[in-house]
């Protein structure tokens, strides 16, 4: 009985650092980090992708059939972008995957910028291809009261 209580306390402590962002709060963080217009993508692109990848949840982890895992708000893959101690990794962002699971998303943003700077751009995220590419993304900024302009054009 005491062991299960200890496990609950440990899990609660781990989640204290996690955060599920509100859409407009995340939009403002992304804009402040310079993502609006970065490599031709708007805050709408980033919000749409993050919504479909993680539901804006910084603690989200997805385990893939190939043995790799995806971490954090942008679901950065352990085979390429971070090191999780399990999956052989290129670790192109030079970071531990677990650093992507807290409320402090500047490191996530810096790594996501590397992903977008690669040849694939935002096409690296299947969710962006399926749900965001070619769509009117203005709804993602509706009501956020910020300077970022939504992208209404199709990126080619």
Swiss-Prot record:
GO terms for cellular component: acrosomal vesicle; extracellular region; sperm flagellum. Its main location: secreted. The active site is at residue 53. It is an enzyme of class 3 (hydrolase). SUPFAM superfamilies: Lysozyme-like (SSF53955). The keyword Nucleus does not apply. It is found in: Secreted. Belongs to the glycosyl hydrolase 22 family. This is Sperm acrosome-associated protein 5. It comes from Bos taurus (Bovine). The lineage of its organism: Eukaryota, Metazoa, Chordata, Craniata, Vertebrata. The gene is SPACA5.
């Amino acid at each position: 009985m005491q062991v299960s209580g200890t496990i609950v306390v440990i899990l609660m402590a781990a989640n204290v650092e996690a955060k599920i962002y509100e859409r407009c709060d995340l939009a403002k963080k992304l804009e402040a980090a310079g993502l609006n217009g970065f490599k031709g993508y708007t805050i709408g692109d980033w919000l749409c992708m993050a919504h479909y990848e993680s539901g804006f949840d910084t603690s989200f982890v997805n385990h893939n059939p190939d043995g790799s895992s995806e971490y954090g708000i942008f679901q950065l893959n352990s085979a390429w972008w971070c090191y999780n101690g399990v999956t052989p990794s290129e670790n192109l962002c030079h970071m531990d995957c677990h650093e992507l699971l807290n409320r402090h998303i500047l490191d996530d943003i810096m790594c996501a910028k590397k992903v977008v700077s690669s040849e694939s751009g935002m096409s690296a995220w299947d969710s962006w291809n399926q749900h965001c590419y070619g769509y009117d993304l203005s709804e993602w900024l509706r009501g956020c009261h910020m300077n970022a302009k939504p992208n209404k054009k199709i990126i080619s």
